[in-house]
Amino acid sequence: MIEDSIRRDVKVVEGPVVMGIDIARRGGDSSAICVRQNNHIIGNGIMTKKGFDLMQVVGWIRDEIENVKKSGIEVSEVLIDSIGLGAGVVDRLLEEGIDVRGVNVGESSSVSTEFWNLRAELWWKCREWFAKKDVLIPRDERLVEELASVRRLWPSNGKLQVEPKDQTRQRLGRNTSPDAADALILTFASYASMTTGKRSWKEPLERKTLGIV
């Protein structure tokens, strides 16, 4: 389902352009930016930077927002993971007059009866996006690997849960989080995505899988 989205010949659908930004939390992690418009990811893949301090990340984000605008594309929402260092990044960008919104994926889901937290809901929205089979993503090996590696858990309380990042790190065989995939799922926290209808995760899947996507 994921790799098919690289080769698929689809009509690009216009709509709001959303930027999702995952902020590195530990030394081995990268900060990542994903720009998505409706059914496709814009550009050559997920942009990543490693080893940046808070102010360097702020400058990088500011530059990338301007680069997108210079290409004639207006970004409607900039969504930043606000856990840990991300909170400082959000505060600084807001101080500079840049319109961004912090997203805490650890908080409660908007559908609390179905999802363990917002992170689980966003991953499920990402899965629904791919399941439509009309999406297009760049050839980004890191993104594909990360999307395929994250597993869902089978909770006793009936709420969908996504495995802890440490488990994903072990599966990936590298001391890094699924930063590229996290940047993509943040785009589904946009106001447009959060107000569209959703299919319950409890409905039968087309194929049996341990993964989310």
Question: Where is each model-derived feature located?
Answer:
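Short, flexible loop/turn motifs enriched in small residues
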Residues: 25-32
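Short, flexible hinge/linker loops that cap or flank conserved catalytic cores
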Residues: 11-13, 27, 72, 177
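Anionic group-transfer/hydrolysis microenvironments
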Residues: 22-24, 83, 106, 184
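Charge-patterned, long linear interaction tracts outside catalytic cores
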Residues: 20-21, 141-204
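ATPase catalytic-site recognition across NTP-hydrolyzing enzymes
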Residues: 1-21, 35, 157-159
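Residue-level detector of short, conserved catalytic/binding motifs and their immediate flanks
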Residues: 16, 31, 76, 181
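Short glycine-/acidic-enriched loop or helix-start segments at secondary-structure transitions
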Residues: 30, 89-91, 195
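Mg2+-dependent endonuclease catalytic cores in nucleic-acid-processing enzymes, primarily RNase H-like
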Residues: 35-159, 205-213
